[in-house]
Amino acid sequence: NTIPLQECAEKGIVVFNTPGGNANAVKELFLFGISMAGRDILGAMKWVYEYDGSEGPIAKRMEKIKKQFAGPEYAGKTIGVVGTGNVGSLVANIALNLGMKVYAYDPYLSVDAAWKVSRRVFRVATLDDLLKHVDYLSLHCPLTDETRGMIGEKQIAMMKNGARVINYARGEVVDEDAMIAALESGKIARFVSDFPTEKMVKAPNAVLTPHLGGTTGEAEANCAKMAAVQMDDYLKNGNIRNSVNFPDVTLERAGSARICLIHRNIPGMLTNIMPVFSRDGINIENMTNKSSGEFA
C-alpha cells in the first residue's frame, strides 16, 4: 500500500506484484492465528514469563489458574472465509482438514481459483449470508474501495455473540473503531490481525503480529523468482502479468520486433496510433489491446 499506483500509471510505470508467492506462508500463519483466536494463549504466555514465584512454585500455581486461559476447540465449529484466491483457497481447504464446516464468499472468484477450493466448502452469494453462520471469520481479500471497512459495525452486529475474527487481508478491511468497540463489549471474543495500530494494541483480546504473513525464506524466494520472470517477460515481450495498475495483456511472440504502447483509455487512440506504422511501411502482423480504468 506504499506505492503511488496512480502516479506510476500516469508516468507509464507498470507495477507488478507476486500473487501466490507467499500463499503457503500465510496459510501456515493462519494455523497460528486460529489457535490464538480460540484459547487465550497470548495471555497464558504472558503469565508464564511474568510469574514471580510469590505464590509458590510455578508448576503448582499454573494448575490452579490455567482455566482462565481456556477456550473452544475449532473442530466442529463453522468458519467463514472471505476471499478464496491464492491464500483463501488454502485456508478454506485446511480448515476442512481441521474438522471445521467452511463457508466461503468471493464475488470476484476466478475459474482458476474455483478449481483450488474443495467441493465441501459451502459458497454463499453475499457477505451477510456468511456472517450469520460463523463462529470464526477469516479475511483474505484485497484492499479495494469496495472492501475498505467491509467488516464494520453493521456486519459485526450480524455475527454470533463471541465470534472470533482473523484478519490476514489488509488492516483497512476492518473498521478499527467498530472492532475495538466489539472487543470491549465482548461481542467479538478475540481479534487476530497481522496489521497492528497504536489504537488496536490497547484493545482487549486483540492478538497482533507485525505483518509476518510472508516472512519465510521460501516465500521471499518464490516472490523474487516470480518478480524476475514477470519483469523479464515485460522488458523482452511487452507482456504484462500480475500488474496492480495496468490490465494483464499477453501475446505470443511471432516476429522479430515488438512494440508495447501504454495510452489513455479514450475513444480514437488506436485510430491515431495505427497511421504512424502505415506511414513508415511497417506491417502489423498481430496485436492485442486491453484496458482497465483510465489506461490501456
What is the predicted function of each stretch?
Residues 1-18, 132, 152-154, 158, ...:
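An N-terminal-biased, well-structured beta-alpha scaffold segment characteristic
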Residues 12-24, 169, 211-213:
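Short beta->alpha connector loops at strand-helix junctions that form conserved
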Residues 19-78, 242:
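Phosphate-binding beta-alpha-beta segment of Rossmann-like dinucleotide-binding domains, i.e.
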Residues 27-46, 93-100, 225-239, 274-275, ...:
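Oxidoreductase and adenylate-handling cofactor-binding alpha/beta cores
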Residues 82-85:
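Glycine-rich Rossmann-fold phosphate-binding loop(s) that bind the pyrophosphate
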Residues 88-89:
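N-terminal Rossmann-fold NAD(P) dinucleotide-binding loop
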Residues 191, 201-204, 212-296:
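NAD(P)-dependent dehydrogenase/reductase Rossmann-like domain
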